[in-house]
C-alpha cells in the first residue's frame, strides 16, 4: 500500500512538472512573467516586491501566497522580502498571518517533493552542497535541526524543508517544528516590515545580525550542554 501511494505521488508530481513546463513555454506571457519574478527577488529591494504584489489589487493576498510557495520551490530565493512586503501592504499582524501560512504551505510542498521524488530532484532544485550542510545538522541535532535552522536567517528555509523530506522524520513532526521555529522570525520581520521605508536598510541589516547572533548563542549553548552531558556519562 505504501509503495502504491509513493508511485501515485510520483505520477501526480511528474504530471504537475510537465504541465508547468508546458505552460512556461506555450502560454504567452508566462515566460516573461517568470523572468520578472526572478529579477524582482534578485533585486533585494522589498519595495519592488511590494509594488508587484499591490498591482494585483483585490487579488494581492492570493498572489503573495502563490509567490511564497514559488520561492520555496525555487530555493534559495529570499522569502524575507515577501514577508516585509506583506506587512507593509496589509499591516504587520495581517501580513504575519499571510506570510506564516503561505510559508508553511511552501515548506509542505518542498518536504513532499523530496520525500516522493528523492535526493536527485531535491539537489537539482537546491544544491548538492546546501543539502549536505543540512544533512550534517540532522546527524548532530536530529529533530532539533528544524528549530535551530528556522532561527538562523543565513540558512535557507527551503533547503531545510527539502532535507527533512529525505530523512525518516514524519511529516507531522516536521510541520509542527517548522510552525514553531518560523513563528518568531515571521513576527519580527513582519513588525519591522510594517515600519519599513526604502531608506531603512541599515536598520534591517542590524536587526538581522542581532537575530542571527541570538540564534548562534542558542546553538552554541546547545552544543556545550551536549558535550558536558557526554563527559558526565563518560565518568560514570
Features from the language model and the residues they span:
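Structured, soluble extracytoplasmic/luminal domains of envelope-associated proteins
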Residues: 88-103, 108
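Membrane-interfacial helix-loop-helix
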Residues: 2-10, 20-64, 104-159, 166-167, ...
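Transmembrane alpha-helix boundary and packing residues in multipass membrane permease domains
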Residues: 83-84, 111, 120, 162, ...
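Membrane-interface alpha-helices at helix entry/exit sites of multi-pass transporters
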Residues: 93-100, 133, 166-180
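Hydrophobic core positions of alpha-helical segments in small-molecule transporters
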Residues: 63, 98, 176-177, 189, ...
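Transmembrane alpha-helical core residues of multi-pass small-molecule transporters
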Residues: 67, 102, 106, 180-181, ...
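Transmembrane helix boundary and interhelical junction motifs in multipass membrane proteins
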Residues: 65-94, 154-160, 172, 179-188
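Extracellular/periplasmic helix-loop-helix junctions in multi-pass membrane proteins
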Residues: 186-204
Amino acid at each position: 500500500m505504501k509503495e502504491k501511494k509513493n508511485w501515485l505521488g510520483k505520477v501526480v508530481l511528474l504530471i504537475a512538472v510537465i504541465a508547468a513546463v508546458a505552460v512556461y513555454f506555450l502560454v504567452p506571457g508566462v515566460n516573461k512573467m517568470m523572468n520578472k519574478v526572478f529579477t524582482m527577488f534578485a533585486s533585494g529591494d522589498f519595495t519592488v516586491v511590494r509594488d508587484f504584489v499591490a498591482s494585483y489589487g483585490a487579488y494581492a493576498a492570493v498572489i503573495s501566497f502563490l509567490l511564497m510557495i514559488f520561492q520555496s520551490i525555487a530555493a534559495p530565493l529570499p522569502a524575507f522580502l515577501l514577508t516585509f512586503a506583506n506587512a507593509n501592504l496589509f499591516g504587520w499582524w495581517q501580513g504575519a498571518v499571510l506570510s506564516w501560512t503561505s510559508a508553511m504551505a511552501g515548506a509542505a510542498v518542498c518536504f513532499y517533493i523530496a520525500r516522493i521524488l528523492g535526493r536527485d530532484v531535491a539537489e537539482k532544485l537546491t544544491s548538492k552542497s546546501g543539502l549536505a550542510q543540512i544533512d550534517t545538522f540532522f546527524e548532530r541535532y536530529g529533530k532539533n535541526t528544524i528549530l535551530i535552522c528556522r532561527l538562523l536567517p543565513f540558512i535557507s528555509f527551503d533547503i531545510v524543508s527539502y532535507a527533512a523530506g529525505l530523512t525518516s522524520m514524519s511529516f507531522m513532526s516536521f510541520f509542527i517544528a517548522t510552525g514553531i521555529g518560523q513563528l518568531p522570525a515571521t513576527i519580527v520581520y513582519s513588525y519591522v516590515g510594517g515600519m519599513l521605508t526604502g531608506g531603512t536598510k541599515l536598520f534591517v541589516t542590524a536587526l538581522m545580525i542581532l537575530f542571527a547572533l541570538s540564534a548562534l548563542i542558542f546553538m552554541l549553548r546547545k552544543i556545550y550542554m551536549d558535550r558536558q552531558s557526554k563527559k558526565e556519562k563518560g565518568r560514570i
